[in-house]
Amino acid sequence: MSRVGKMPVAIPAGVKVNVANGIFTVEGPKGKLSQDYHTEAVDFKIEGDHVLVTRKDDELQTRAYHGLYRSLLNNMVTGVSTGFTKTLVINGVGYRAEVQGKLLVMALGYSNDFSVIIPEGIEVKVDQLKVIISGASKEAVGQFASQVRKLRGPEPYKGKGIRYEDEIIKRKVGKSGVK
């Protein structure tokens, strides 16, 4: 039995889980998320305030799907109830970011500013040199944060660029010069 897959997913108050036609849908105060699944691999049983994910056989691929769909369901329930947040830190002279409507506009030391379209379901706030990305979908929040970070990743000598708040950049020593 999968260690991840056998654990039940708790459903908090105000969250509804629906499973029908190969799609499981989770609806809550922060939004509505849905995900299709392999009906030949797993079943979902809604029992009161929790959901159990069971697999139909013991094949290798089915066991992989078992843990995967349980994790996806758990992340969706967490997302629609509390949401997910990623914080990016901008470090560099003249580097700045601002939200203009549905665009995140950033000056990152190049001749032109970067304009990134904020996807549907994602909320972006800029607090001085921090960009706070939040939303119900863990995948969408992480994907957008990665896309923004990729514009100017942190460099190891001075630490300039965009990094995650909890990311530790391994610093390097510059050239020492011959005397």
UniProtKB/Swiss-Prot annotation:
Transmembrane segments: none
Cited Pfam families: Ribosomal_L6
Keyword terms of this UniProt record: Ribonucleoprotein, Ribosomal protein, RNA-binding, rRNA-binding
One function term, GO molecular function aspect: structural constituent of ribosome
Any one Gene Ontology BP term: cytoplasmic translation
GO cellular component entries: ribonucleoprotein complex; ribosome
SUPFAM superfamilies: Ribosomal protein L6
InterPro entries: Ribosomal_uL6-like, Ribosomal_uL6-like_a/b-dom_sf, Ribosomal_uL6_a/b-dom, Ribosomal_uL6_bac-type, Ribosomal_uL6_CS
PANTHER family: 60S/50S RIBOSOMAL PROTEIN L6/L9, LARGE RIBOSOMAL SUBUNIT PROTEIN UL6M
Subunit structure: Part of the 50S ribosomal subunit.
Function, in words: This protein binds to the 23S rRNA, and is important in its secondary structure. It is located near the subunit interface in the base of the L7/L12 stalk, and near the tRNA binding site of the peptidyltransferase center.
Homology family: Belongs to the universal ribosomal protein uL6 family.
Record's protein name: Large ribosomal subunit protein uL6
Gene from which the chain derives: rplF
